[in-house]
Amino acid sequence: FADKRDSQCLEQIVELTEENLKENGIELQELLADGGYSSGEALAYLHEKNINAYIPNFGQYKSEREGFTFNKEENYYQCTKPEGNQAKLLFKGEKTDSKGYTKRTYRSSETDCKNCPLREQCCGKSTKFKKLDDSIHKEHYDRMHQKLTQNATYAKKMVRVRSKTVEPVIGTLVNFTNMKRVNTRGIKNANKHVLMASLTYNLKKYLRFITKK
């Protein structure tokens, strides 16, 4: 997984985890991950699999557009600024940027914004129209945002669980056991190295909680 972003690895990680859990008669019901695993594709996969996930949306996500409301039925943005010209930003198509993200573009006409007193503030000094871009996976980001905000208490609890159980592992292995590098050649040997380190970590953790005789 080292040559990919975390979000690109989520599907394979989930499948491997499910296989391991099934061998022990355990069903995957909830999934916790940090924002690095957030992507439209990852959230779409989890939704399709009906997995109840708690993953903070990535940094560029915006749940609301200040001064604009979205008309889902007719697929356009409406300017709602009291001092503005109430322009409509119509859907203009989809475009993939240099980073590989496909977005939907919404744009007003120059005529609608031409004499608006907020044009320069809203559009910029040289631009004559307003443009907004949304991810093609916006519905999945919105669904996750709604879950995290409507169930804020439980979502925060899940963050604490993740912080206590998942995030300290790599820090412990690197800082306390000095596993700053894998001293093996090849992916298979590196995988064995990490598996043994994980096994040792889990065994030490287990021994802390068993009843002492």
Language-model segments: residues:
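Anion-binding and metal-coordination hotspots
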Residues: 1-213
